[in-house]
Structure formats: structure tokens, C-alpha cells
């Protein structure tokens, strides 16, 4: 580190990385570099709308990033932590004093499913959503579409298509909307039933073919277009770089989001997990960990002790087409309570949230340090740590 201009590199320009890079500007004496493989910001929460042809999922970085953030369009292929160096796909090398690891998540590998990579359309990245959009636009209006995935991504994709009058089937490996309470799940099921969407719960897809999907019992169902929303995985960059990861490949950090291996590496977003506080892959988690990761780096630079990351969840909201939505209220630990909201007002709230996410990132770029979030009490965080130790 130089005395005048420490260099902080942020890997990944999604919700977490963009938030972190902007927030770092609170220290006016550092150089900030954001590395992202695309020239545009991807609003991932709108990918299902983009794929269906009902929305836009990209935005220019220029108004999104603060003036002191330098964008490098490239991808990291290896982190050399002892040398504090990042090797990029282009062949270039970046030196850093601190690194924020925020590369996000990608499609679930779903190892062992024949035909998945060849014939299915994943819905976790812009490029795959773009291919799906072309397939939908060039297909007949009555072709059979199969969406695989019982979570929010699968439900929102299936409902967006059903709202357009498309012929949709939703295959759920377990129950529909497993993170929601029973009343909210019934609301979602009733919405699909009114639109004649065939929802197959506790049913696994074992093979994807060009014109069908094969279920675990051997049944082959016709499917001209198969959309895969069966979960998310993370890139193997941390593991390949010799850093400690969990069973899913997520970078392991302590409760300040600092890597268990290297105090110069701090994590944020989907590709990271703490040893003390379990978090859900989500935009909300990404934004908050991005802000907290920046705060941790700023504390390190200032020579002060970073504060433990604390987060309280309040709910999960999913859209059902353009005119309806379901908001599942949760406890601070993200477990569902019995209450939920639905209807047009909830749909308006969902759209308000979707619009507010990029607005919040732009605001952080203009006013670094402005973002705040709901936090759990220290006692609750300590309880989470105790539960991890006991397990």
C-alpha cells in the first residue's frame, strides 16, 4: 500500500459490487477500480421481464457509478492473494491493496442432467435471457413452454408468460414457493390455476430434450421451450485461487465479511457466505453486503476495527404478471410468518422496489454512505454464531 493512494479493486459490477464501489468513495484518498465482464449494468430482477419481452434489464454504467470509480470491462481468471494481484481474461494484471470479491452467482450446474446445457434456457444471466427472448419471439404463440424451478425466479418467469397468454407448465422439484408460508403459497397456486398453468410439485426433471422434458418417473412431457430456473451456483474463481469456500463454492468470510484466509480480501453478494450469519441469495442481501463490505475496507484503511455485519430480513416479494404480486412478510431471520399481502397494490409496491434498486445505487454514487438497511440486534447475531458453532 502506498501512503497516498491505496488501490481498491471490486470484482463484479452487479448489485453488491456497484454498491461497494460507490460507497468506497467516502474515502477521497483511494483509487477505485470496478471490474465487470459487461459494459452495461444488468438489473437482474427484471431478467424475466426482458426474456418475456415486457421489460428492459440493462442500464448504462455512467449514471450508475460515482465519478471516482473506474470501470474495467474484463473478467478475473485468478486471484494471487499473496502477491495482491488479479489476472484478467484479457491478459492484463491488476495490483490491489484491498479486494472486494463480489462476482455474484450464475446458473446452477445441475450436474448429471443430460441435455440441460444444450436444450434449456437458464435465467440467471443476461446472455441466456437474451437467447430465451429470441426463442420466445420466434416461436408460435401456442407452443408448450416448461419452466423448471419452484423459487421466485421460476414463478415470476412462468407468471410473466402466463399473463401474456402463453401455454406454460411449471415443474417444481419440491413444493411451490418453498420459502413462503402456506397461505401465500395457496394464493400463488390459485393465481396459476385461474390461468390454467399446470403446476407439478415434488417433480424432478432428469433430462432435457429438444422438444420435451423427462421426469423422474420416466414420463416425457412435450416442451418446445424449456426454461431452467432450478437454482443458482457461483463461479469457481475463489476455489481456483486457493481461497477457502463452502460446499457450494462461496467465499468463506468472518462476520466482518473479511476472507478467512486473507485480511486484504472482503466479500459481498451471492458468491460469499459468512461463518456466523446465514444469508439468502437476493438483491437485498447483495446491496447490504456490498455496503457493509465497503465499510469494512474503509475501516481497515482507517486503522479501525470493522463492525460485524448485521442484517434483518423483512419480507420477500414476487410478481405474478404485471397486475398482481405476493409479499410474504418474514421474521428477521427470513423465516415466513402467516401474514402476506397480494393484489394490485402489492404489484405497485413490487414495481416501486424494482425501480428503487438502481435509483439507490445511483444515489450511493452521488452521496457515498447514504444507504442504510435493517439490522438484527447484536444478541441475535451472537445467537446465529452460537448455532453455527453447535452445529
Feature names for model-found ranges:
Residues 117-141, 220-225, 229-288:
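FAD-site-proximal beta/loop scaffold in flavoenzymes
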Residues 2-5, 69-144, 227:
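FAD-binding core/adjacent interface of flavoenzyme oxidoreductases
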Residues 2-70, 156-182:
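Beta1-alpha1 glycine-rich phosphate/pyrophosphate-binding loop at the start
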Residues 2, 322-391:
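C-terminal auxiliary extensions adjacent to catalytic cores
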Residues 239, 247, 271-321:
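A conserved FAD-binding loop/helix module that cradles the flavin
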Residues 70-79, 83, 94, 164-255, ...:
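A Rossmann-like FAD-binding core segment of flavoenzymes
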Amino acid at each position: 500500500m502506498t501512503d497516498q493512494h491505496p488501490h481498491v479493486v471490486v470484482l463484479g459490477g452487479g448489485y453488491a459490487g456497484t454498491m461497494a464501489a460507490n460507497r468506497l468513495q467516502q474515502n477521497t484518498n483511494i483509487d477505485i477500480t470496478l471490474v465487470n465482464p459487461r459494459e452495461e449494468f444488468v438489473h437482474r430482477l427484471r431478467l424475466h421481464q426482458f426474456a418475456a419481452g415486457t421489460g428492459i434489464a440493462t442500464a448504462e454504467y455512467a449514471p450508475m457509478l460515482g465519478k471516482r470509480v473506474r470501470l474495467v470491462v474484463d473478467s478475473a481468471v485468478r486471484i494471487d492473494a499473496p502477491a495482491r494481484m488479479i489476472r484478467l481474461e484479457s491478459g492484463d494484471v491488476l495490483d490491489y491493496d484491498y479486494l472486494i470479491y463480489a462476482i455474484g452467482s450464475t446458473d446452477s450446474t445441475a450436474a448429471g442432467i443430460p441435455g440441460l446445457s444444450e436444450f434449456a434456457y437458464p435465467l440467471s444471466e443476461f446472455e441466456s435471457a437474451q437467447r430465451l427472448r429470441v426463442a420466445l419471439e420466434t416461436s408460435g404463440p401456442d407452443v408448450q413452454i416448461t419452466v423448471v424451478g419452484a423459487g421466485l425466479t421460476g414463478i415470476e418467469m412462468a407468471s410473466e408468460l402466463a399473463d401474456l397468454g402463453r401455454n406454460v407448465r411449471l415443474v417444481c422439484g419440491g413444493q411451490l414457493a418453498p420459502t413462503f408460508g402456506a397461505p401465500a403459497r395457496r394464493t400463488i397456486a390459485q393465481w396459476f390455476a385461474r390461468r390454467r398453468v399446470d403446476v407439478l410439485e415434488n417433480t424432478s426433471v432428469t433430462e432435457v430434450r429438444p422438444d420435451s422434458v423427462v421426469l423422474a418417473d420416466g414420463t416425457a412431457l412435450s416442451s418446445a421451450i424449456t426454461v431452467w430456473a432450478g437454482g443458482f451456483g457461483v463461479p469457481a474463481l475463489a476455489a481456483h485461487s486457493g481461497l477457502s469456500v463452502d460446499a457450494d463454492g462461496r467465499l468463506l468470510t468472518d462476520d466482518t465479511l473479511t476472507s478467512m484466509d486473507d485480511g486484504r480480501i472482503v466479500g459481498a453478494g451471492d458468491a460469499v457466505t459468512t461463518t456466523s450469519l446465514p444469508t439468502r441469495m437476493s438483491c437485498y442481501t447483495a446491496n447490504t453486503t456490498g455496503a457493509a463490505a465497503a465499510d469494512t475496507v474503509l475501516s481497515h484503511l482507517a486503522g479501525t476495527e470493522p463492525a460485524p455485519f448485521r442484517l434483518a430480513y423483512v419480507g420477500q416479494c414476487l410478481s405474478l404478471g404485471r397486475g398482481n404480486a405476493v409479499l410474504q412478510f418474514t421474521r428477521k431471520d427470513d423465516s415466513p410468518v402467516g401474514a402476506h399481502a397480494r393484489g394490485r397494490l402489492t404489484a405497485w409496491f413490487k414495481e416501486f422496489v424494482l425501480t428503487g434498486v438502481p435509483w439507490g445505487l445511483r444515489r450511493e454514487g452521488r452521496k457515498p454512505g447514504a444507504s442504510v438497511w435493517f439490522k438484527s440486534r447484536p444478541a441475535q447475531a451472537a445467537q446465529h454464531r452460537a448455532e453455527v458453532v453447535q452445529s
